[in-house]
């Protein structure tokens, strides 16, 4: 005889096609027909300094109100120049991000401390450049990832996978991935490769399966795994991609290259600048929003001490 439905099953029933995920910016939600669709991927394109990080932090912080838990900030920046996530979060939202450092090697104690459960920022993937930079030739003339790099990358997953799993199990339903650099051919980008792996194999992996892979031996942690199941179809992802183009017109004319995540994303928003009289204005436009009505307007926005505002 089956027992009562778990909280994850109940929540998944509530995630219907009419559900919406608020960005935290009411005017942008209106342009998106009420908000983002739950469980989907949204890509924000724009040049460095245009306001992508502010928009991402606004989205993540809004999880505190909308979901009962803030979103995660996964920073893929590998250049060493801080994008000031912690500073912005504290100044704009009085939110102390905290950095996740907890790792769970196989058969080790999996559970993070209360302090780590209050940490919503990770910068565990610090590799940038071309995929080929991390590969070596094989005897048959093809290429494969260098074993030393693979070992280091797999080691980083001992931090990344628990970062997502334990926070999703505690109620987080949104994640912002920042720090993705421009690349002539996105298919050659190591950052796009790692994001694709993260998105398919961790963010949208069955919660029970992910828990069984992290919490070993399973028999010892079965009660925790069962009690912390969550519907991965409710996790909404915002990917912030830096572009070489700065003008909105150039971004709107930008072609989707082979391997570009935007080709498979549900929603695309572009942020660019345009000359308005004697000043340079920042403009926003929704380019794609599958499964929903959307505005075709080009709207001015500002990034101020109060954060990201439209109009």
Which stretches of residues belong to each language-model region?
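Charged, amphipathic alpha-helical linker segments immediately N-terminal to NTP-binding catalytic cores
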Residues: 1-15
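Conserved inter-motif catalytic segment of the P-loop NTP-binding fold
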Residues: 75-183
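Charged helix-capping and loop-helix junction motifs
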Residues: 190-197, 253-259
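Conserved ATPase-coupling elements of RecA-like P-loop NTPase cores
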Residues: 183-194, 206
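Pre-Walker A adenine-sensing motif
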Residues: 22-35
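Short acidic, S/G/P-rich loop/turn micro-motifs used as interaction or catalytic elements
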Residues: 50, 181-187, 246-249
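Phosphate-binding/switch region of NTP-binding enzymes
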Residues: 211-307
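Walker A/P-loop NTP-binding active-site region of P-loop NTPases
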Residues: 34-108
């Amino acid at each position: 005889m089956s027992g009562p439905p778990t909280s994850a099953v109940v929540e998944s029933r509530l995630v219907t096609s009419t559900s919406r995920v608020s960005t935290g910016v009411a005017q942008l939600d209106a342009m998106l027909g009420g908000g983002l669709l739950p469980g989907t991927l949204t890509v924000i394109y724009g040049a460095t300094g245009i306001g992508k990080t502010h928009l991402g932090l606004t989205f993540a912080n809004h999880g505190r109100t909308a979901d009962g838990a803030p979103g995660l900030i996964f920073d893929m920046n590998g250049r060493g120049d801080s994008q000031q996530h912690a500073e912005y979060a504290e100044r704009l939202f009085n939110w102390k991000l905290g950095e996740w450092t907890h790792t769970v090697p196989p058969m080790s104690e999996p559970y993070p401390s209360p302090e780590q459960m209050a940490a919503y920022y990770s910068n565990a993937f610090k590799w940038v450049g071309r995929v080929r930079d991390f590969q070596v030739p094989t005897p048959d003339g093809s290429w494969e990832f260098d074993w030393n790099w693979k070992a280091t990358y797999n080691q980083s997953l001992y931090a990344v996978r628990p970062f997502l799993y334990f926070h999703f199990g505690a109620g987080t339903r949104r994640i912002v991935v920042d720090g993705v650099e421009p690349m002539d051919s996105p298919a050659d980008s190591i950052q796009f490769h790692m994001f694709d792996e993260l998105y398919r194999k961790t963010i949208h992996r069955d919660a029970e399966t992910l828990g069984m892979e992290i919490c070993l031996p399973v028999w010892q942690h079965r009660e925790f795994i069962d009690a912390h199941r969550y519907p991965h179809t409710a996790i909404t992802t915002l990917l912030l991609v830096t572009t070489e183009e700065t003008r909105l017109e150039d971004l709107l004319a930008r072609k989707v290259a082979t391997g570009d995540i935007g080709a498979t994303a549900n929603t695309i928003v572009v942020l660019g600048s345009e000359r308005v009289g004697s000043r340079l204005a920042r403009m926003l436009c929704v380019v794609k929003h599958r499964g929903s009505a959307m505005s075709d307007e080009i709207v001015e926005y500002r990034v101020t001490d109060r954060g990201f505002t439209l109009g």
